[in-house]
């Protein structure tokens, strides 16, 4: 995309947005040029809340499919557009409704906690949904005497179990990007930047190993990372998550330096959303995300419980 072309396209997107009474919501892993035209950039929890709060008639969701589904479930009266319907999620794809039903059959009094990175059909079977920003708080409030099934991210689940001291049954799912971030990637960076603070996303595969290397690591959601980096005294940060967050970190804390643990930790699904696709989506009102009401109605309860916490 040439410079003029990029700027002209961005102007067209903003013009169409006004014309359609639309709001553009973007996840922190989106391409920088997509983040720049968004009305709000944030994590799953912030985006879900913003979708609930908006007065716009149209929500253009620059993220992956389950996020647009979440916005559609929370706003049945609004039009939700996903600029590329192929923007999926390996973690959300890892679990099926049958997996949850099988566990429920064995644990009729059990509680199913679904990470927001799941399809609507799985959320519909959950008692509560969580994001990485509020999973610890939600789980710590659950009744002590009932079994809990945490799906689908086993690394986030292990982190929640570690912090809350609760015994959780974990589904063996993972995000392929975060699971690929390992201790060996971290070691060299920490040696090169001995004074740097270490920010790690709880989906990372190296959770316990990385904490062993750097016991004072901060395990945070993407929003938590931005908030922490802005307020911390440290000038250098080593960051373990998808690299799209670096644009936002540098923008919101320009005087600080950020080093990705794995510079090629890129979610190809997130990067499917381009400025051109945002433009076409708004221009033609294409790629509307709809969730059948019999699924949405059940999933809505679990999502509303999530949005209320943290």
UniProtKB/Swiss-Prot annotation:
GO terms for biological process: 'de novo' NAD biosynthetic process from L-aspartate. Pathway: Cofactor biosynthesis; NAD(+) biosynthesis; quinolinate from iminoaspartate: step 1/1. InterPro entries: NadA, NadA_sf, Quinolinate_synth_type2. Binds 1 [4Fe-4S] cluster per subunit. Iminosuccinate binds at residues 27, 44, 115-117, 132, 201-203, 222. One of its GO terms (cellular component) is cytoplasm. It is found in: Cytoplasm. Its cofactor is [4Fe-4S] cluster. [4Fe-4S] cluster binds at residues 89, 175, 267. Pfam families: NadA. One of its GO terms (molecular function) is quinolinate synthetase A activity. It catalyses: iminosuccinate + dihydroxyacetone phosphate = quinolinate + phosphate + 2 H2O + H(+). It is an enzyme of class 2 (transferase). Keywords: 4Fe-4S, Cytoplasm, Iron, Iron-sulfur, Metal-binding, Pyridine nucleotide biosynthesis, Transferase. Its EC number is 2.5.1.72. Its main location: cytoplasm. The keyword Phosphoprotein does not apply. NCBIfam families: nadA (TIGR00550), PRK09375.1-2 (NF006878), PRK09375.1-4 (NF006879). Catalyzes the condensation of iminoaspartate with dihydroxyacetone phosphate to form quinolinate. Belongs to the quinolinate synthase family. Type 2 subfamily. This is Quinolinate synthase. It comes from Thermus thermophilus (strain ATCC 27634 / DSM 579 / HB8). The lineage of its organism: Bacteria, Thermotogati, Deinococcota, Deinococci, Thermales.
């Amino acid at each position: 995309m040439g410079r003029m072309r990029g700027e002209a396209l961005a102007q067209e997107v903003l013009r169409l947005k006004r014309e359609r009474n639309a709001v553009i919501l973007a996840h922190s892993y989106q391409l920088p040029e997509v983040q720049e035209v968004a009305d709000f950039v944030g994590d799953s929890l912030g985006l879900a809340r913003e979708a609930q709060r908006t007065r716009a008639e149209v929500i253009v969701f620059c993220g992956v499919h389950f996020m647009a589904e979440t916005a559609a479930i929370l706003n049945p009266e609004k039009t939700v557009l996903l600029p590329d319907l192929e923007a999926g999620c390996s973690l959300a794809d890892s679990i099926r409704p049958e997996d949850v039903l099988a566990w429920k059959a064995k644990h009729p009094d059990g509680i199913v906690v679904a990470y927001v990175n799941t399809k609507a059909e799985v959320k519909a079977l959950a008692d509560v949904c969580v994001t990485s920003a509020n999973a610890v708080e939600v789980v710590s409030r659950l009744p002590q005497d009932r079994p809990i099934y945490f799906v689908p991210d086993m690394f986030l689940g292990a982190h929640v179990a570690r912090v809350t001291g609760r015994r959780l049954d974990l589904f063996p799912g993972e995000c392929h990007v975060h699971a690929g971030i390992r201790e060996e990637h971290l070691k060299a960076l920490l040696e090169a930047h001995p004074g740097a603070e270490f920010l790690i996303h709880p989906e990372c595969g190296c959770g316990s190993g990385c904490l062993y290397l750097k016991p004072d690591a901060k395990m945070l959601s993407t929003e938590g990372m931005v908030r922490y980096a802005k307020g911390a005294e440290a000038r250098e940060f080593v960051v373990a998550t998808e690299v799209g967050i670096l644009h936002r970190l540098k923008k919101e804390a320009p005087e600080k330096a950020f080093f990705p643990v794995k510079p090629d930790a890129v979610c190809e699904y997130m990067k499917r959303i381009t400025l051109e696709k945002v433009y076409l989506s708004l221009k033609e009102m294409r790629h509307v995300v709809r969730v059948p009401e019999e699924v949405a109605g059940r999933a809505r309860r679990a999502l509303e419980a999530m949005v209320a916490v943290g």
